Amino acid sequence: WAPDIIHVHGWMASLLPLYLREFYKEEPLFKESKIVTSLYNSGFEGELNSDLAVKVKFDLSENDKISTIETPTHTNILKSAIENSDAIIHGSEIISEELSSFIEEKGMPVLEYESENLKESYLNFYADLLSAN
């Protein structure tokens, strides 16, 4: 069973898109999968362990893919998730201006925050994403 869409939620799962795109890029199971990342107005102050990039480098062959997380702030690890995703969903009404600008620069599909009609909005967004090959 190959997933059509892998939906990642929040900063805790933000390295998953990088690993799927780089470490598992030859894995037939994930080759055609679309990655969607949901962003929320929650996170942490400061930085994660400064060895994070070193640990990720150990797994990945292309070190240029980890430059964003060399300073592992909340914003930077989310930028890494965005860079390695096919689409973004605003899971909160407020997303930082820096992340909003970064997403806009990438020109990727975005589902803005929805407080109602979630099911219909998500299904339509997924359908559009899958049909945009």
Regions of interest found by a model, annotated:
Residues W1-N133:
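Catalytic cores of nucleotide-sugar-dependent glycosyltransferases that transfer UDP/GDP/TDP-activated
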